[in-house]
């Protein structure tokens, strides 16, 4: 946790909301006590959030061909929350840092080959009860679970009329 993140978590334990907003990737080295990434290069909205006992799992996903950046080694990743005192601002809740560049992930916007990436981050929130995330539109595709849920939805989720399916003459017994 960053110093700001620690304060947000303590306030969350006292009943304030903890609202995760985005995840940023950079190629800097923030160092101890940092409240922000040293060199943020990519900012992604959260695609999904799942709460467990003392943690929240945040997922982000993207396709390399949609990135408007040059390639970089992601040596720092920051998870951001809404500032509890000013909802128009964000605070860095926690930072992950890789000091050995060769162990970091390379974010490659190379358009010659499509790479779809999903990252899941398990973030400690202790016993804070009011935890949420501002979800953005994913930049990739539906997950297998989402596709299976849609496939198994027998309530005509696309609202296709019987006539369009060639079943206009069949009586609806549902």
Model regions and ranges:
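N-terminal assembly/attachment segments of tailed bacteriophage virion structural proteins
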Residues: 1-137
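Fibrous stalk/shaft segments of extracellular and virion attachment machinery
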Residues: 129-174
């Amino acid at each position: 946790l960053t110093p700001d993140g620690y304060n947000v978590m303590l306030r969350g334990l006292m009943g304030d909301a903890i609202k995760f907003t985005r995840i940023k990737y950079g190629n800097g080295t923030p160092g101890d006590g940092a409240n922000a990434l040293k060199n943020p290069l990519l900012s992604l909205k959260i695609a999904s959030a799942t709460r467990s006992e003392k943690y929240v799992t945040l997922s982000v996903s993207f396709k390399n061909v949609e990135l408007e950046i040059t390639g970089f080694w992601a040596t720092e990743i920051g998870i951001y929350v809404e500032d509890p005192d000013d909802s128009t601002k964000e605070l860095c809740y926690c930072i992950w840092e890789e000091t050995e560049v060769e162990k970091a992930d390379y974010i490659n916007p190379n358009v010659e080959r499509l790479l779809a990436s999903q990252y899941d981050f398990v973030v400690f929130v202790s016993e804070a009860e009011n935890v949420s995330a501002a979800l953005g539109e994913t930049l990739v595709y539906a997950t297998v679970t989402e596709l299976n849920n849609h496939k198994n939805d027998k309530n005509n989720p696309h609202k296709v009329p019987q006539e369009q399916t060639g079943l206009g003459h069949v009586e609806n017994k549902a």
